[in-house]
Amino acid sequence: FAMRSVVFALLMTALAVSPSQAQTAADFPTSPVRLFVPFAAGGPTDVVARILAEQLSARWGGKPVLIENRPGAGTIVATALVAKAPPNGHTMLVATNSLLINPAINHSLPYDTLKDFASVSMIATQPVALVANKSFAPSTVQEVVAEAKKSPAPLNYTSPGPRGVGHLAGEMLKQRAGIEMVHINYNGSAPALTDVVAGRVPLMFDIWHSAKRYVDAGQLKLIAGASAERFADASNVATMAETYSGFQVTAFNALVTPAGAPQPVLEKLSADIRAVVSSDAFREKTKHLGINAYGNTPAELSAWMRTEIARWQEVAKAANLQAN
């Protein structure tokens, strides 16, 4: 009798919770939603976040979706703030590759990427490319590797910033090809591209959209794309993966929220975001950024993030990369 009483009580509790959770998801959001952007206003991630916020607000009947720009410490400032927010789905981080790379190079983060966050949805990806100064002799990955192997000094390359996705793409090439290259640090894509165009640095891993106008102008040349397939607007140029199997490097924006958010809320958030980013309105407003807009489920994003973290940990360890 006692056991049946316990079972009955548990069933009543479950029945009492389920409608409440469903109601919570149906009513979401019940207060302003805040999207934390780990960069200053005006950059590509900020622009994507503002377009997303505007269209999410419209989908939610005009309920406010606010942008909080919190740059600093290689995105750690904003990430730590979100990690400590109430786990109710009303606070989200507009995550970039740094969310996955930082754990590989910094072992004293004020948060645990895998434990302190719940995945919501991808927003968009951008392909990465290896480009070179127009006067640099090699024009393919194989020729770059051959040049590096015969050069008495390591080849220099650059990226938009140290310990970012472009930097680690170069480290991955070094490891896969067995060559020596030295990363030249810049603070941002624009100054790095300027010096590659000027011939001060021969090679650069950058977002294809950022480098493309220089390639189109004949100031740079595309060595290879780091995406799964050849670029639609440069289909004559091979991918990195055609030489080194599995060599794919993608810049991304995704949404994560503090761990512990109710599952029905996560599912509603993800479904609404997927609906927005797949809409013609969102794609029309973001097409000038050169992004591939798409969403996925919390489970899909979480699985992808785990794979990416493991990959960057392997690359960073082999390169002995550590945060300052």
Where do the PLM segments sit?
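Hinge/capping helix and adjacent helix->loop/strand transition within the periplasmic-binding protein
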Residues: 84-90, 104-191, 240, 245, ...
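Extracytoplasmic/secreted proteins, especially bacterial periplasmic and envelope-associated proteins
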Residues: 47, 51, 55, 77, ...
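An extracytoplasmic/periplasmic, membrane-proximal ligand-sensing/linker region
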Residues: 30-32, 175-176, 216, 223, ...
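N-terminal (or domain-start) structured segment
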Residues: 22-116, 154-156, 162, 178-203, ...
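Short secondary-structure boundary segments
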Residues: 96-97, 134, 208-209, 227-228, ...
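Short beta-strand->loop
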Residues: 112-122, 158, 180-184, 202-203, ...
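Short, low-complexity disordered leader/linker segments with a strong preference
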Residues: 1-30, 142, 324
